[in-house]
């Protein structure tokens, strides 16, 4: 999308391969062993995502195996936690983050049922210098920002942060178990990726469902804290319907849930946050 380069003043991304969104340690080792020469952007940090964009979850052990060689090279580590709650609900130990060598953690609140907010946790205090200025430069200073941040307190104190994510994960597992289409990736968090033909996808769109083909060609479904079992069952009933003339309205008559807009199982609308080895712009390498 160009966002990293725009906000990073020329920062580039070096994509790293891996199965189902998890970086292959061998691919990372190969990237780290690349020579530092003038015609290559030098690496600066490793960016990881947990849960990943394909709905899989890194264990603390798997993250440690990726982070250790990066720290040995003197690079930084960024952990994108847009779906960190979903990873925690799937068994990832949140307390392990502070011992893994992560320098900067972004904790997503939106997907756990909060307003559109993220909490930035800076473990390397050197990176915190004038962070307020960076926020202002990025336009991240909304009026009354404390009201956006306040839900984090309640959600963390009463366990809602992980509880909501556990529900989303359970709905994804339900969808994966019932879908008539082959599931492309392991369902470990709240995402389900299926192999679907264009005709079926077209019928979904015509019926009002919001789903699209992801980077690998699979069709992406995301379940949220608000997704109901009835919505999942209704969607599955429609997917299994032989009559393509059936619509979402037709199935509402058959499903035990009220007609309130689009199905809660609809795509969450956020863009992908790719896992990559970040690279500093050559012109500002010494900054």
Walk through the language-model features, giving the residues of each.
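Conserved PLP-enzyme active-site core in the AAT-like
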Residues: 1-207, 211-227, 235-243, 247-266, ...
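N-terminal non-cleavable signal-anchor helices
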Residues: 233, 254, 281-283
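Long, low-complexity, intrinsically disordered segments
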Residues: 265-287
């Amino acid at each position: 999308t160009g966002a990293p380069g725009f906000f990073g003043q020329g920062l580039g991304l070096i994509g790293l391969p891996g199965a189902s969104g998890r970086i292959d340690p061998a691919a990372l080792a190969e990237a780290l062993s690349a020579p530092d020469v003038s015609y290559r952007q030098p690496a600066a940090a490793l960016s990881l995502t947990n849960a990943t964009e394909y709905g899989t979850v890194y264990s603390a052990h798997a993250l440690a195996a990726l982070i250790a060689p990066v720290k040995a090279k003197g690079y930084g580590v960024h952990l994108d936690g847009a779906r960190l709650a979903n990873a925690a609900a799937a068994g990832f130990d949140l307390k392990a983050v502070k011992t893994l060598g992560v320098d900067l953690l972004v904790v997503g609140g939106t997907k756990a049922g909060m307003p559109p907010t993220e909490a930035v946790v800076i473990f390397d205090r050197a990176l915190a210098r004038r962070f307020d200025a960076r926020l202002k430069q990025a336009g991240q200073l909304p009026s009354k920002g404390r009201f956006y941040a306040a839900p984090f307190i309640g959600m963390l104190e009463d366990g809602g942060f992980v509880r909501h994510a556990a529900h989303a994960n359970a709905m994804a597992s339900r969808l994966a178990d019932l879908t008539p289409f082959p599931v492309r990736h392991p369902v470990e968090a709240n995402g389900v990726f299926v192999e679907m033909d264009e005709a079926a996808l077209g019928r979904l769109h015509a019926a009002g469902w919001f789903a699209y083909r992801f980077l690998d060609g699979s069709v992406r479904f995301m379940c949220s804290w608000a997704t109901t079992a009835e919505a999942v069952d209704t969607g599955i009933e429609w997917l299994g319907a032989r009559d393509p003339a059936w619509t979402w309205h037709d199935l509402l008559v058959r499903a035990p849930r009220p007609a309130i807009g689009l199905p809660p199982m609809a795509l969450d609308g956020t863009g992908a946050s790719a896992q990559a080895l970040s690279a500093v712009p050559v012109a500002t390498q010494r900054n």
